[in-house]
Each structure stands twice: as C-alpha cells, then as structure tokens.
C-alpha cells in the first residue's frame, strides 16, 4: 500500500508516520512524505502512485490572514487537482472545529472541506474531513497553538504560566487516539459523519484550563513528593505521558533520599494514593534487618540481587519459618500482618530487595512494633 502524507513533518504528521512505520509489515507499505521542503513537482508523481492520502498540511498561525487561503485552500485545491488526474485515491483531511465559526481560519478550513467534497463527487473517491478540537501529545510545538504543549514545556522548566480563566472549558483529543482512528479509517473502519459531512475523533476529553494547570503542577511536584498520579484516569495518564515528553534532555533524572547507615540503605521510590509505596532496601553482608511486626500493614519483598533468608514468627508463637531468597531465583515473599519478621544477608555481596507496602509510611502512625524473630 502506498500512502501519501502531506504535512508529515508537523505534529500530527510525525506521529502518524511513526505509527505507520511501526504497524504491520513495512514491506507492504510505502510512505510518501510531502513537507514544505519537498519539491512541488513531486506532488504530481505521488498523486499518480498513492493508494490513500492523509492530507494534514495546513496553516493555523500565519503572519497575515491571506496565508490561511494559501495554506489551507490553495494547497488542498492543488493536491486534489493532482489526484483527479492521478490515482483518485481516498483522502482523509484534517480540518478544525473552528470550521463552524465565522473567522478567517474557520472560513479557510470550510473552503478546504468543500473542495474535498467536490473531489469526492467528481471521482466517487471516499473522503473524510476530520474536524479536530485541540490535539495534545508528544512533539507538539510549545508557544505556538497548543496550551497543553506550552504549559508542559514551561512547567517542566519552572517557567511561570499564565491562566487567565481557570474555569475556561476546553475539549481535547490525544494524539495516539487521533492516529489510531485515522489508521482505522484507512483500513476500512469508519465512524458516523455529522450533518456537515464531517467526522470527529471518538475519544475526547473535556476539562478546564485550570484543571490542566493543576495536574501539570502536580506532575512537577512528583520529584519531591514521590506521589505518582492515578493512571486509571485516561486523561491523567495521557497528560502525564505528554508532560514527560517535554522534559529538558538534561532533566530526565532526579535524586532520591537514600537513608544509609553501616547496615545498608533504604530508599523510597514511589508513593501512591491507593496502591501503597515502593522502595528499595540494601542490606550489607552479615547484617539482619527488620525484627518488627505490623497490625494491618503488609508488604511484599522481592530480592533481586544477593543471597538471604527471610524469617517469620507469629506474634505469641514459637515456630520460626524461613524462606531462602536470592537474585538467582526471583520470587515474591508476602509479609503478613501479625508476624514479626527479619531479612538477613547470608552472602558475600549486598542483598538488594525491592519492597512494596500496602500503605505509604506515616511517621505519626507507623504501625510498626519492634520484636525479635
């Protein structure tokens, strides 16, 4: 299949091209990219050979309003003229929800839609005009036309953002949802068109500008609080992925509070509101740690390096239960409430244990009681 993508160097185009390259057999797909740097003479050649067209090229932030016509209407007309005398391939074109508005940008997108519909009438080729709201995700240019991209870029760098109206509503679509739907259309799965003959991405997110800013500031604070966001909320999950893509390249890592002594170290890694706490514990050779029990708190220990023994004794009982553990045989050992327990390094190297607790450590209510096994 030969696919023409106009605007392939743009935000949506880059994501679409990478999805196409990584879906299916690359030997069964040829992607022809048309950008601002592509000689216009190649457009006729591409339009003769293509089986499907993603027309993503357009203008939304021109220096003057005349560029709306040149970038949105004239280019579309030029493309469709080449397709008429070429392969007459199906076309999916990105439009905007602003096409319903009476402004220069909206009028130019509406005119491009009309040209697309006329092409379909003339050639019987299927066409799909997608009216998109704000699109967010990786690779969107900050300080251009996306509030999400700008907020992510600035907050990741501790640059102040401006929120004029926190309650201002905003509807967004996520880039991966957009690209998935576009590819599905190319492969024959098409949704319902609206009364204007246009299509909308099915998965949308309605929120406010203030809510976005609050979430992003919370993401920034994770490096101090260790409290990761709720990933069961689709919008939060997508926004967090987007935020991380805007981190400066010298800012991917951040330090943790490594509590060290002669016995080894203990370091909290992640805290969650509803899934407990994740930590890493290092125990030096010959050292025993623990010697305590919990009323309700419970844990899971996973030794990933070294050799050790985890011992248990039910509070009030005499029997000692032993579980040999090592990094050569990774397994989970549950630490139930009501059992005093310890972990001893019986090897010659550091014993490294990944630990999960069902609750975050609270120094005011530790639920931890000293008692030797």
Please provide the spans of the model-predicted regions.
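Substrate-positioning beta->alpha
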Residues: 142-150, 167-187, 210, 214
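Conserved Rossmann-fold NAD(P)-dependent oxidoreductase catalytic core, especially the SDR/UDP-sugar
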Residues: 77-113, 120-123, 128-130
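NAD(P)H-binding glycine-rich loop region in Rossmannoid oxidoreductase-like domains
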Residues: 38-86, 98-102
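A short glycine-rich, His/Asp/Glu-containing loop-to-beta-strand
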Residues: 252-291
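Short acidic-glycine-tyrosine-enriched beta hairpin
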Residues: 314-337
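N-terminal Rossmann NAD(P)H-binding glycine-rich loop of SDR-like oxidoreductase domains
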Residues: 3-22
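Mid/C-terminal beta-alpha module of Rossmann-like enzyme folds, strongest
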Residues: 184, 188-258
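Conserved beta-loop-beta element that borders a ligand/cofactor-binding pocket
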Residues: 114-141, 153, 159-168, 198
